[in-house]
């Protein structure tokens, strides 16, 4: 497993525009090293015969069929509106003539 060096952490911090003290750089390189060790252990445990997945269980669509139901006519919809004009809803302007 490749080692995470302090210089690599410093380079990444610079790329991300993150200011880090010398102590933070040392701590972060050690923390990242531990994380990579754990990831490596998980990869080794999985083996080549395990199919990679994004979820531990299979997902399936649990939604109902998308079937159009009764719809309002244009007139029925506009009857409920406080104001309409030329077959469209009329609402107050909000952008001062833009």
UniProtKB/Swiss-Prot annotation:
Key words of the record: ATP-binding, Ligase, Nucleotide-binding, Protein biosynthesis
Gene for this chain: gatC
UniProt superkingdom: Bacteria
NCBIfam families: gatC (TIGR00135)
One GO-annotated biological process of the protein: glutaminyl-tRNAGln biosynthesis via transamidation
SUPFAM superfamilies named among the record's database cross-references: Glu-tRNAGln amidotransferase C subunit
Subunit structure: Heterotrimer of A, B and C subunits.
Entry function: Allows the formation of correctly charged Asn-tRNA(Asn) or Gln-tRNA(Gln) through the transamidation of misacylated Asp-tRNA(Asn) or Glu-tRNA(Gln) in organisms which lack either or both of asparaginyl-tRNA or glutaminyl-tRNA synthetases. The reaction takes place in the presence of glutamine and ATP through an activated phospho-Asp-tRNA(Asn) or phospho-Glu-tRNA(Gln).
Originating organism: Micrococcus luteus (strain ATCC 4698 / DSM 20030 / JCM 1464 / CCM 169 / CCUG 5858 / IAM 1056 / NBRC 3333 / NCIMB 9278 / NCTC 2665 / VKM Ac-2230) (Micrococcus lysodeikticus)
Protein's recorded name: Aspartyl/glutamyl-tRNA(Asn/Gln) amidotransferase subunit C
Family from the record: Belongs to the GatC family.
Pfam families in the cross-refs: GatC (PF02686)
């Amino acid at each position: 497993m490749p080692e995470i060096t302090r210089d690599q952490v410093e380079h990444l911090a610079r790329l991300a525009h993150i200011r880090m003290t010398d102590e933070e750089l040392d701590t972060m390189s050690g923390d990242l090293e531990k994380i990579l060790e754990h990831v490596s252990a998980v990869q080794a445990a999985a083996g080549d015969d395990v199919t990679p997945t994004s979820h531990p269980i299979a997902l399936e669509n649990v939604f109902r069929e998308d079937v159009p139901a009764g719809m309002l006519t244009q007139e029925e919809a506009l009857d409920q509106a406080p104001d309409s004009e030329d077959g469209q809803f009329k609402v107050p302007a909000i952008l001062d003539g833009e």
